[in-house]
Amino acid sequence: MLSLIFLFCFCVCMYVCCHVPLLPSVCMCAYAWVLVFVYIVVITSPATAFTVYVFCFLLPMLLLHIHAILSLQ
């Protein structure tokens, strides 16, 4: 259940990050990062924590960064 709540909150944050102009979305990205950090702290397995960190934080932030760069061009 905790995973579903986390996933829902993270998806909402990422949706706002990708569909709101860049300045307000910076705040939502920070909230998404906090959600990921809290979720990683709750998880006990280091391998699972690393996997969640890579797939739920690093890759979405990379995609958001690429989206922002392409939007500015």
Swiss-Prot record:
Pfam families: Papilloma_E5
Keywords: Early protein
Domain of life: Viruses
InterPro entries: Papilloma_E5_alpha
Family, similarity comment: Belongs to the papillomaviridae E5 protein family.
Protein's recorded name: Probable protein E5
